[in-house]
Amino acid sequence: MSNEDFILNAEARDVSGKGASRRLRREAGLVPAIVYGGRKNPQNVTITLRELTKHLENEAFYSHIITLNIGDSSEQVILKDLQRHPATNFAMHADFLRVSKTKKFNTKVPLHFINEATSKGVKEQGGKVQHSMTELEIACLPADLPEFIEVDLANVELGGIVHISDIVLPKGVESIALQQGEDHDLPVASIFKPKGVAGDEDEEAEGDAE
C-alpha cells in the first residue's frame, strides 16, 4: 500500500446537467463530480481543475483511499470513474465511491510487470512480452487496498502464459474474475517469438543443408 495521503477539497453544487457542467469548466475552472455509495444519497460537487489535475499525475491516486473534504464534512472515497476531454485530455467529470472501513469494495488497480528483460523467455530464448491486461479488478477492505499488484515474469519461458491465478495477490485482496469461476481465469501476459526470428530448429536445418 502507498503511504501517501491524498486530500481533495470540494464544494457542494446544486445545479446539474450538461449546460451547467460546461459553464463550470469554462468560466470557473471547476470540474463537476459526483459522490455516491454507502447509505447516503448521491451528492454533486465541484473540484478545482488545477487541484484534481495535480493528483491525477500520480499513479497512486487512482488506487488509493482519498479524503474528500466537502465544506465542513469529509468523506473517505476512491476514484471510480474519470471522463477526459478527447482532445486536451483534461478532466471533465469524476465519480467518487464512498468506502467503509468495515466493508469490502470492488475497484481496479494497475499491474506492474517485473523482470521482463531478464525472464527466461526474453533473455535466453529471444522472445517478446505481450501484456493482455494492465489492471485487475479486485475486492478488499480499504486498509488492504494495494497501490499496484506485481506480476513477476522471471521464470516465464518462451510460449509461456501468465494467468490471473498465477498472480500472488496481497493479503486480504481477492480477484473478482476468479470469484466467477475458472472460465474467468484470463491471460495476463505471455512471451512469444517475434515474426521473422528464426528458431533453433531452423538454424539446425540450415546447417545440415550446408
Swiss-Prot record:
Gene Ontology cellular component list: cytosolic large ribosomal subunit
GO terms classed as biological process: translation
Source species, domain of life: Bacteria
InterPro entries named among the record's database cross-references: Rbsml_bL25/Gln-tRNA_synth_N, Ribosomal_bL25/Gln-tRNA_synth, Ribosomal_bL25_b-dom, Ribosomal_bL25_C, Ribosomal_bL25_long, Ribosomal_L25_dom, Ribosomal_uL5_bac-type
Keywords tagged on the record: Ribonucleoprotein, Ribosomal protein, RNA-binding, rRNA-binding
A Pfam family annotated for this UniProt entry: Ribosomal_TL5_C
One of the record's GO molecular function terms: 5S rRNA binding
Gene3D superfamilies noted in UniProt: Ribosomal protein L25, beta domain (2.170.120.20), Ribosomal Protein L25, Chain P (2.40.240.10)
Summary of the function given for this chain in its UniProt record: This is one of the proteins that binds to the 5S RNA in the ribosome where it forms part of the central protuberance.
Family classification: Belongs to the bacterial ribosomal protein bL25 family. CTC subfamily.
Assembly description: Part of the 50S ribosomal subunit; part of the 5S rRNA/L5/L18/L25 subcomplex. Contacts the 5S rRNA. Binds to the 5S rRNA independently of L5 and L18.
PANTHER family to which the protein is assigned, alphabetical: RIBOSOMAL PROTEIN L25/GLN-TRNA SYNTHETASE, ANTI-CODON-BINDING DOMAIN-CONTAINING PROTEIN, RIBOSOMAL PROTEIN L25_GLN-TRNA SYNTHETASE, ANTI-CODON-BINDING DOMAIN-CONTAINING PROTEIN
Protein name per the record: Large ribosomal subunit protein bL25
Origin organism lineage: Bacteria, Pseudomonadati, Pseudomonadota, Gammaproteobacteria, Cellvibrionales
GN (gene name): rplY
